[in-house]
Each structure stands twice: as structure tokens, then as C-alpha cells.
Amino acid sequence: MNRIEFSNMLKGKRASLDISKYKVSKDTGLTALQLNRIEDAANSYSMGNIFKYLGAIGCHIGLYKGKQSCVLNGINDFGIWVTKKRGQKISMYALAKQIGSNITTITRIETNQSAVGVDLFLKIVEAFGYELKIESV
């Protein structure tokens, strides 16, 4: 999945729940420009803002691979998930190389010391072979 597909999924979920951008902006504190950046996917954006957006529309991210699943309600959940998955399967160096990043970035994600962009988030989810879904809580 790429950023455009992810953004279209977010926009579609918001529209299907009949929630206005104004309400999302009011509930999250995100500006109209930030919401447009998320929904139009012209540029990358922070997953921190995505989790605010999802909270405002009453949703979360579900990750699925066969019988394995994980629910992400915030960026901290993502760091924990990466640590758990990487520890079982792949070294930090191998993951960084696979997603075109570096060990420092992986360390910061796992210790919740770094803002994660949507493109990196999607690459990591794909690297572990998981399918992403936006689900109502």
C-alpha cells in the first residue's frame, strides 16, 4: 500500500461515517491545511496526526497477517509492535536495509523518540507482511 491508497482509505472511512472535516479539525486541533495534506496525500505526513485523525472519527488501525493481528491506537503502540516483530524475525540492520532507512531511525521508532512519517510506517508494515485496515472502534 502506498500513501495515496492509505489516504484514500482514510478519506473514504471518514466519509462513510458521515463525519465532516470541520468536526475532525475541531476534535484534533489539526488545521484545514493539515487535514488536506492527509487526505490529498500530495506530501508525506506524520503518523501522530493520523492517530489523532483516527481518534476523531472513532477508528483505529488493524494489522493482519494470517491468524496474527494487532490493533494500533497510537504511535507508541507502533513502536512496541515493531520491537516485538523485529525481535522475533529480523535484525535492526536487516530491517533498516529492507525499508531503505538506517539503524538510528529504527531505534528511535522502537523507543518512541521519533515522529514516524506515513511512508516509513507503510514500508515497515509491508516489510513484516501485514495487511492494514482502518476499523471502527
Show the residue positions of the predicted features.
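A short, Lys/Arg-rich alpha-helix, primarily the initiator
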Residues: 1-16, 64-88
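DNA major-groove recognition helix of helix-turn-helix/homeodomain DNA-binding modules
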Residues: 46-63, 117-134
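Tyrosine-centered aromatic motifs in long, intrinsically disordered, low-complexity repeat arrays
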Residues: 6-9, 22, 50, 57-59, ...
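Hydrophobic, helix-prone linear segments
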Residues: 1-5, 37, 44-46
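Short, structured motif recognition centered on aromatic/hydrophobic residues
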Residues: 10, 61, 82, 106, ...
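Short alpha-helical DNA-recognition segment
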Residues: 18-36, 88-107
